[in-house]
């Protein structure tokens, strides 16, 4: 079978101080083993809590060793590198089909928010899901998780953040089933109890004929809503421009349909970042590519 080409990996971690002295293992040639079970471990993600501990998450194929399989496992280390959970990690998310492409952030209460994709029906039908765990790795939003979007097509490139109220904010791309040459953007807010706050199956942000969308990003507007930004090529296959939208606390887009243009220069504007200005606005930075010249630009929005 083709799956036999999969190598057997393990997960190791090391931490060095500023003068390159090993902190967790006395032998500088040896790293700290996190998971060494048979089958593959990959797609590692890290998240710290407010007490100096570290959550380590990964996709683990021990129970479903095929290219379409893999569950989410995790380990927690204290600041001295001592594992706090069971050997080779706790099972966090499991089920039929692969659980993958995890995004994780600190929840501000020594736990974590998780958003990931799964493929329950086919290789091309990826749903988007969320969960919150506490400091012991226990699920806080029920065993069935929270479905963010499902049944519409392929979700991808999700980005997450947390607002000042402890709500989870996420944004993602969607390739609709039956329209493979068009990408849309959706977003969602989930409160700390796991209750979806905006439209069921996601709030539509950009519904255009754009073939490609690059890396949507989201940040809190510090008023219960959010700023979002992305690049798309609605104006030409090789002409990616920057657009943005602001969403109110109740899930209403406040600016023009499909976003306002931030930069529409000829060429490609991509690899963007968005930050709060800590005064209700947002600051954007992006790469501007003109043939062989790369430049960095920025803009403030409110």
Model feature map: region roles:
Residues 9, 20-21:
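Cleavable N-terminal signal peptides
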Residues 22-302:
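Extracellular, repeat-based ectodomains that mediate carbohydrate processing or recognition
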């Amino acid at each position: 079978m083709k799956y036999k080409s999969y190598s057997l990996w393990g997960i190791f971690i090391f931490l060095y101080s500023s003068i390159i002295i090993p902190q967790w293992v006395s032998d500088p040639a040896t790293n700290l083993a996190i998971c060494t079970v048979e089958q593959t471990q990959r797609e590692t993600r890290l998240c710290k809590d407010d007490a100096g501990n570290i959550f380590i998450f990964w996709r683990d194929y021990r129970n479903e060793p095929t290219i379409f399989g893999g569950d989410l496992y995790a380990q927690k280390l204290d600041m001295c590198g001592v594992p706090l959970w069971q050997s080779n990690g706790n099972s966090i998310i499991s089920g039929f089909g692969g659980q993958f492409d995890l995004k994780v952030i600190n929840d501000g209460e020594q736990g974590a928010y998780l958003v990931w994709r799964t493929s329950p029906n086919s290789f091309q039908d990826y749903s988007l899901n969320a969960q919150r765990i506490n400091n012991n790795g226990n699920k806080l939003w029920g065993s069935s998780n929270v479905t963010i979007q499902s049944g519409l097509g392929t979700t991808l490139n999700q980005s997450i953040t947390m607002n000042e109220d402890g709500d989870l904010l996420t944004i993602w791309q969607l390739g609709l089933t039956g329209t493979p040459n068009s990408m849309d953007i959706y977003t969602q807010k989930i409160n700390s109890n796991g209750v979806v706050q905006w439209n069921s199956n996601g709030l539509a942000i950009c519904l255009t004929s754009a073939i490609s969308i690059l890396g949507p990003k989201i940040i809190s507007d510090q008023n219960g809503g959010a700023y979002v930004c992305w690049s798309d090529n609605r104006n030409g296959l090789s002409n990616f421009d920057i657009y943005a939208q602001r969403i109110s606390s109740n899930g209403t887009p406040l600016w023009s349909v499909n976003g306002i243009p931030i930069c529409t220069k000829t060429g490609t504007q991509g690899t963007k970042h968005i930050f709060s200005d800590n005064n209700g606005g947002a600051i954007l930075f992006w790469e501007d590519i003109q043939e062989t010249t790369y430049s960095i630009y920025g803009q403030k929005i409110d």
